[in-house]
From Swiss-Prot:
It comes from Shewanella loihica (strain ATCC BAA-1088 / PV-4). Belongs to the DNA mismatch repair MutS family. GO terms for biological process: mismatch repair. InterPro entries: DNA_mismatch_repair_MutS, DNA_mismatch_repair_MutS-lik_N, DNA_mismatch_repair_MutS/MSH, DNA_mismatch_repair_MutS_C, DNA_mismatch_repair_MutS_clamp, DNA_mismatch_repair_MutS_core, DNA_mismatch_repair_MutS_N, DNA_mismatch_repair_MutS_sf. This is DNA mismatch repair protein MutS. One of its GO terms (cellular component) is cytosol.
């Protein structure tokens, strides 16, 4: 705990001294300080909460001579305010009264009982149902980065080692953490500058020995080799920080975090940050979820299935055996039609994954247990259907679903059919589960029946027709009579309260009854809470099996969903081959075909060792980018185990998918559009291999014509001749269509259009050969460019086309020639003979003048 200056505390009242001491425990979080029926915030917390939540900012007297800013929220509405703060990536410490005001002199004892941070949420009301909520930590070593993620709401704990800044950037985009922990001396702040929910942690929390010890304690093992974590030092340092942080915030045991896995990038097709963004896998270019691959593929029955599907989309596999097992399972579900009934059964399971996590940390609510009971009741039906399947994958999933007859029987006996949301007010434990509880409830209910008898008797005795017996928390039980009949009440009635139109009284008999009722109700509620806690103890021994059940059910949901999507959207099974290349017949863009107002034109693609690169030409709006993206998306879909939008697809080994499509200024990093484009191009040229799929769209547009053409030509030449990557290269530089004449593994394809007078119709059909023209003026007219401007452009175009190209573009031809000829220079030859480390400043200056004369 951070120390609080003693002299400073002495200036304040006892209550504010208590508040400031508690606030020092969590100085970087808002402190919700419980006072009666409100959570109060003071000082800067009050100002900040007022601004963030739109609540009134007031003052509470003075302490230390100054007015104390104050804001408050009702305790019963706290979840709504917490949800808003979590969305804003703001953390909150919740302080409750734990002492008894009746027996306490001075401030009631309080302590922080709960800490809510964006990355450690488990409460259903605070979580996005169909999105993972990850806490992450990153540690920068001398060579590379260690990265760890933990989903506290499921127990999923993953680490990975990353060799470069680019790899870390891609991993941050893939995992999209809600909260990121990093060390105080993290040396690459620019990498995480745009992330919200960052939290700096002291360097000692990343200490290797401390981290290793924490992990051993958490998993109850002697070493971590059984998890495959023998040589991942940096990521273990990040993982240790996560465990420490979660223990600090949750303040309870975490038995559901019982394993840790390593994410090996070599097991998956590598997607860099630009590719994940450009392909709009789970988020579109505007940051939303509409019109993404996930929005089309996700018709899952359960939230946990939806979250797993999104993880699969970001982790396309390279292991063909695992993928084929998924394809076989889909085939069988389609053949026997089980996917429809399984979908309905799975829909009733709910979110067992997160319910199990709340069970583990003892924060589950009554309705969680009711949903768990329902899920366990459905298991035999699901397993009965899967018993008839031959797919090894479906059989394995069925066995992992488990068997829980005793747990189902327990919950059926213990929990009422429709429990309330909270245990706080009782009414959760079913009648017949516990004899003593039933007795206290009967006593309480019998006392309630007595009130009706008392009311009838007193009405008859007094003759007051308005007489009734009531109850409130302030005055307890009372007899109420209208003021016009108050003269009818006997002397034995003691006036308790006068209202506008009524008088309220108590009698000795009613007071005795009140004590009896409150005693029986209190004892019943206390016993019910005790029995509720015992249910956690009875279910906890099956925690690991329940987690396995949740994982298997989620995967079964995804596979069933793939079968349903294949049937509804006319997807077909792709063939995964050992031969290099991608061959697709009648391929379609999975998203565009769903939102297009006109029938989608299917197109083929053929890439193989003799045809490594396609130069794609055609008009703007002709469909070049859509065509390229659909090839990448079909390839990715095949590798997550889905069927694909194509009549036929045969896809060989793929290690990476790169995209260089579109660009915008990166203002945060001070990079222009062209700089962003060149950075992405450089990444591709450094890392692409013969098994990489590369999409290059219009590179070189952000600079002069000659510079742009030179860069585009050289990049295409390098990809085709040296890297031999499978490449789709879209361009408006028609000079690039000459590449197939110089390189055997390059071919031209184009998307055509038809002109009629001044209009243009885009055919969207891919054809062999180069496009004849770009149709730029027609597209400008369609875009609404004023007719006068378009007409003037036509005149200028005719003028330029009529000029002698031999006179007009000599530099361009020279630029093209230089791309294919080695550059020689006396200055370069002289530079090759120089050792720069041995030069004195004077020698370096003399050499500079010498080189200037040689250029």
């Amino acid at each position: 705990m951070n120390a609080v200056d003693t002299q400073y505390l002495e200036k304040h009242t006892p209550m504010m001294r208590q508040y400031l001491t508690l606030k020092a425990e969590t100085p970087d979080m808002l402190l919700f300080y419980r006072m009666g029926d409100f959570y109060e915030l003071f000082y800067d917390d009050a100002k900040r909460a007022s601004e963030l939540l739109g609540i009134s900012l007031t003052a509470r007297g003075k302490s230390g001579g100054d007015p104390i800013p104050m804001a408050g929220i009702p305790y019963h509405a706290v979840e709504g305010y917490l949800a808003k703060l979590v969305q804003l990536r703001v953390s909150v410490a919740i302080c409750e009264q734990i002492g008894d005001p009746a027996t306490t002199k001075g401030p009631v004892e309080r302590k922080i009982v709960r800490i809510v941070t964006p990355g450690t949420l488990t409460d259903e009301a605070l979580l996005q149902e169909r999105q993972d909520n990850l806490l992450a930590a990153v540690y920068h070593g001398k060579v590379g980065f260690g990265y760890a993620t933990l989903d506290v709401s499921s127990g999923r704990f993953v680490v990975t080692e990353l060799a470069s800044k680019e790899a870390l950037e891609a991993e941050l985009q893939r995992t999209n953490p809600a909260e990121l922990l990093y060390s105080e001396d993290f040396s690459e702040p620019a990498l995480i500058a745009s992330l919200s929910g960052k939290r700096r942690r002291p360097e000692w929390e990343f200490d290797y020995d401390t981290s290793y010890k924490l992990l051993l304690e958490q998993f109850g093992t002697k070493d971590l080799y059984g998890f495959g974590l023998g040589e991942v030092r940096l990521s273990l340092q990040a993982a240790g920080c996560l465990i420490q942080y979660v223990k600090d915030t949750q303040r309870t045991a975490l038995p559901h975090i019982n394993a840790i896995t390593r994410f090996n990038q070599c097991d998956s097709i590598v997607l860099d940050a630009a590719t994940r963004k450009n392909l709009e896998l789970t988020r579109n270019l505007q940051g939303g979820s509409d019109n993404t691959l996930a929005s089309v593929l996700d018709n899952t029955a359960t939230p946990m299935g939806s979250r797993m599907l999104q993880r699969w989309i970001h982790e396309p596999l390279r292991n063909h055996n695992i993928i084929r097992a998924r394809h076989d399972a889909i085939d069988e579900l389609l053949d026997n039609g089980y996917h429809e009934s399984l979908h309905e059964q799975l829909k009733a399971l709910g979110d067992i994954e997160r319910i199990t996590a709340r069970l583990a940390i003892r924060s589950a609510r009554p309705r969680d247990f009711a949903r768990l009971r329902q899920a366990l009741a459905l298991l035999p039906e699901i397993q009965q259907q899967l018993a008839d399947c031959n797919s090894p994958h479906l059989k394995a999933l069925s066995s992992h679903l488990g068997d829980f007859p005793e747990e189902h029987a327990l919950l059926s006996r213990a929990i009422v059919d429709n429990p309330p949301m909270l245990i706080r007010d009782g009414g959760v434990i079913k009648e017949g589960y516990h004899n003593e509880l039933d007795e206290w409830r009967k006593l309480s209910q019998g006392a309630t029946d007595y009130l009706a008898e008392l009311e009838a008797r007193e009405k008859a005795a007094t003759g007051a027709s308005t007489l009734k017996v009531g109850y409130n928390r302030v005055h307890g039980y009372y007899i109420e009579v209208s003021r016009r009949e108050s003269d009818l009440v006997p002397m034995s009635y003691q006036r308790r309260q006068t209202l506008k139109n009524t008088e309220r009284y108590i009698v000795a008999e009613l007071k005795e009854h009140e004590e009896k009722v409150l005693s029986s109700q209190g004892k019943a509620l206390a016993l019910e809470k005790q029995l509720w806690e015992e249910l956690f103890d009875l279910l906890m021994p099956r925690l690991h099996e329940l987690q396995a059940f949740a994982r298997a059910a989620a995967e079964l949901d995804v596979i069933t969903n793939f079968a349903e999507r294949a049937e509804q959207l006319d997807y077909h099974r792709p063939e995964l081959t050992a031969q290099s290349g991608i061959h697709i017949e009648a391929g379609r863009h999975p998203v565009v075909e769903r939102v297009s107002q006109t029938p989608f034109i299917a197109n083929p693609v053929s890439l193989n060792p003799a045809r490594r690169m396609l130069i794609v030409t055609g008009p703007n709006m002709g469909g070049k980018s859509t065509y390229m993206r659909q090839v990448a998306l079909i390839t990715l879909m095949a590798h997550i185990g889905s069927f694909v939008p194509a009549q036929k697809a045969a896809i060989g080994p793929v290690d990476r998918i790169f995209t260089r499509i579109g660009a915008a200024d990166d203002l945060a990093s001070g990079r222009s559009t062209f700089m962003v484009e060149m950075t992405e191009t450089a990444n591709i040229l450094h890392n692409a291999t013969p098994e990489s799929l590369v999409l290059m769209d219009e590179i070189g547009r952000g600079t002069s014509t000659y510079d742009g053409l030179s860069l585009a030509w050289s990049a295409a030449e390098h990809l085709a001749q040296n890297l031999k990557s499978m490449t789709l290269f879209a361009t408006h530089y028609f000079e690039l269509t000459q590449l197939p004449d110089q390189m055997e593994n390059v071919a031209n394809v184009h998307l055509d259009a038809i002109e009629h007078d001044d209009t243009i119709a885009f055919m969207h059909a891919v054809q062999e050969g180069a496009a004849s023209k770009s149709y730029g003026l027609q597209v400008a007219a369609l875009a609404g460019v004023p007719a006068k401007v378009v007409q003037a452009a036509k005149h200028k175009l005719h003028h330029l086309e009529s000029r002698d190209r031999e006179e007009e573009l000599p530099e361009l031809r020279q630029a093209q020639l230089s791309m294919t000829m080695p550059e020689t220079s006396k200055a370069l030859d002289r530079l090759d003979t120089i050792d720069p480390d041995s030069l004195t400043p004077r020698q370096a200056l003399d050499l500079l003048y010498e080189l200037k004369q040689l250029r």
